[in-house]
Amino acid sequence: VAFFLRKNKEELKVARVYNFSAGPAVLPEEVLKEAADEMLDYRGTGMSVMEMSHRSKAYDTIIKEAEADLRELMNIPNNYKVLFLQGGASQQFAMIPMNLMKNGVADYIVTGQWAKKAYQEACMYGKANKIASSEDQTFSYIPDCSDLPISEDADYVYICENNTIYGTKFKTLPNTKGKTLVADVSSCFLSEPVDVTKYGVIYGGVQKNIGPAGVVIVIIREDLITDDVLAGTPTMLKYKTHADNDSLYNTPPAYGIYICGKVFKWLRKMGGLEKM
């Protein structure tokens, strides 16, 4: 019996499943092994990252290293903030209009279920215009976005850059005619090099490409972070709250950010986004 159990344990060690789920999805085995090695004692602290205070020096190093590595991977300019938040990508459907709808108007390009949900949410906070859509053919294509009817007073133009359900992706970013581009990149985050300067906001839940569920990363240009938000916006849903506190206004999804940081280091070790 002992031999049988030992043999099966050995088999389990190599019986990794290739999980092609849209998310949560597979993580690098090297990252999981490192996390396992540090589970009970993170670098001599005598505790797991799950147990340590997010105000501690050890955790401050973890979150700062994670941001620094992400900035290097994506070549994020200094005039952009990196926020590690909670609530998933779906919470951004509300945070974006709450924080960015200065004129109460935004344009949406609806190319799948996630863009549709974001559009529907934005309608609750102002005038959301559907300026292009592929819903007429079950979201099976990306509409021509070279000459869109951009609203003159639009605060931003919104897209979901990659659509896992329908297998479509923006090969070329839409011509926003000078308006701020906001993009949900949850399912293509860190899959290829990106020119961050073409966006005002890039965000995504990490569970598809980067780490465990529970973290959303928001990369936002600093001029978009203001106190001028919709009346009644809760403190926790203001980008400025989190930007002013380096993502530590409240207890963050600490362990998830720790794993994300390990994935960033793994990606750098693999050669960066150019090798992806």
What role is predicted for each listed range?
Residues 90-157:
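PLP-dependent aminotransferase-like
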Residues 28, 206-276:
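Active-site C-terminal subdomain of aminotransferase-like
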Residues 16-67:
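A glycine-/small-polar-enriched, mobile loop at the entrance of the PLP active site in fold-type I
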Residues 23, 122, 133-189:
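Active-site phosphate-binding strand-loop segment of PLP-dependent enzymes
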Residues 1-13:
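Short, Lys/Arg-enriched N-terminal segments with co-localized hydrophobic residues
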Residues 46-92, 99, 113, 121:
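Conserved N-terminal alpha-helix of the aminotransferase class I/II PLP-enzyme fold
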